[in-house]
Amino acid sequence: MRRQGLQQLQRGSRACPDHGGGPVEEHDLLATSWTWAGREPVRERIRAVADAGFAGLALALDDLHEVRATTGFADLRRMLDDAGVVWVQLGTLGEWWSTANRADQDADRGVVLEAAATLAAWQVVVRADHSVPGAPPGRMAEAWDRLAMQAEGVGARLVLEPEPWSNLGTVERASRFVAAGHPNGGLLLDAMHALRGGSTFSSIAQGVVPATLAAVELSDGLLHTPNGMTLAEESRDGRYLPGSGAWDLPGFIRTARGLGYAEPWGVEVRTPALRARPLQDALRVAAAATRAVLDAADAHGAPPAPAMPTSAAPTSAVDFDRPRPPVVPDAVLRRRTGPATSA
């Protein structure tokens, strides 16, 4: 059984006593490569991801090359199994359509496909063309289909992450590209890239082919890109904790669900303040913030919580203070008892 299939069998719901004991959905979180990046050894970082409550993680190309040259992918799989990680995402591959720098591209593709086979990876992520002018998407179609077939051969799905500064700059356009290609292709819907690319909840709901939606990543952000910062720089250093920015993430989540998306929810957060924290603390904060936003999306349209009582609460024995006799000043006592006499 593949990793994600096992997790789907194990997933359930927990009771919520504050709302009459009704079920509250348990959500799988996936830490993207930036979210759990650090200088610690891979084994320690994987353990930190699992301890923070994540069920999945994304491995970057640098990590894959390092593991292949040192411990090997079989040992990495044991680390993931021991930590209980069940969703594994690999990438991100670039220039997969290009005939230039073939040696580097072939090396990256080879390490990703080898890792996907050994790790029973869920997905392989690729990006579009960042060059100016970008390659016409039609020229990329054949390479996309070929890579999608290669990913299928090792049991993973190929997913495209559209970025606003690429030749497939909107999720709607990227979805059309994916839908026209190999059925093993999919779309990664990233909150920052989608909203900064000009998409709205309505355009996503109407313009994304439901069958293409394969992954979702959550982060929060400011209302506008800060002055002096490019979109790419904001994407790298301005990804705030879910719920701490200006975006309607519960609405974004409901839009993705309306297209049929279920689990897991990628968490891609990266700011100077988060990077300054110990990795385990940063991961715990990121997981808690994301779960709060998902819970808010779950609660949309649900019956309101019971009203708080309006009558005064009775005084409990713990709060009860025993009456104390009044304190009488010494001068008053002397007047009452008269002057002291000596023997």
Residue ranges and their predicted role:
Residues 10, 15, 47, 81-82, ...:
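Active-site acidic/histidine proton-transfer and metal-coordination neighborhood
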Residues 24-40:
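Boundary/entry segment of secreted carbohydrate-active catalytic domains
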Residues 8-10, 28, 57, 90, ...:
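Acidic/histidine-rich catalytic cores of soluble enzymes
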Residues 38-49, 103-115, 198-206, 249:
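Short, acidic/polar
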Residues 277-299:
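C-terminal helical cap(s) of enzyme catalytic domains, especially alpha/beta-barrels
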Residues 36, 266-281:
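A short, acidic, flexible beta-alpha connecting loop/helix-capping segment that sits on the rim
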Residues 49, 57, 80, 116, ...:
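Conserved, mostly hydrophobic/aromatic
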Residues 26, 55, 59-142, 193, ...:
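Structural motif corresponding to the early beta-alpha repeats
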